[in-house]
Amino acid sequence: MERRRIIETKHEYFSPYNRFETVAIDLKWLPLSKDEKLEHEVFIVQFDPESSSSLHKHKGYEEFYVIDGELIDDDGKVFRKGDYVKFEKGTKHSSYSKTGCTLLVILYAGTNELNG
């Protein structure tokens, strides 16, 4: 019995980022894995140049690896290709990419979009 799943991401369609009420057309994503019971999900997200994520709060941890490009967090911290970042439970933030970037994201317990 096969107990693995292989996703050849270069052949997959990245759809507009629709995890929140508002669809972010300048962010694209490819869901890779999700466990509803454990509230755990893994996905790849691509930021177009000059795009940003909405302000959101993490109900659990968020971890991501910068595959390519640069991401700037709302406090000015720059994350570059090869960086691995972990946000603690309860973190509120938004991010921006001037040049575009690709991230491998791991979420625990999801996020809530915040207004302003």
Cite the ranges covered by each PLM segment.
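Structural motif
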Residues: 40-42, 64, 101-102
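Short glycine/proline-enriched turns and hinge-like loops at secondary-structure junctions
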Residues: 57-59, 77-78, 97-99
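Conserved short histidine dyad/triad with adjacent acidic residue
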Residues: 28-58, 72, 88-92
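A short, N-terminal "cap"/entry segment at the start of jelly-roll beta-barrel domains
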Residues: 1-39
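Glycine- and acidic-residue-biased ligand/ion/polar-headgroup-sensing regions
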Residues: 58-74
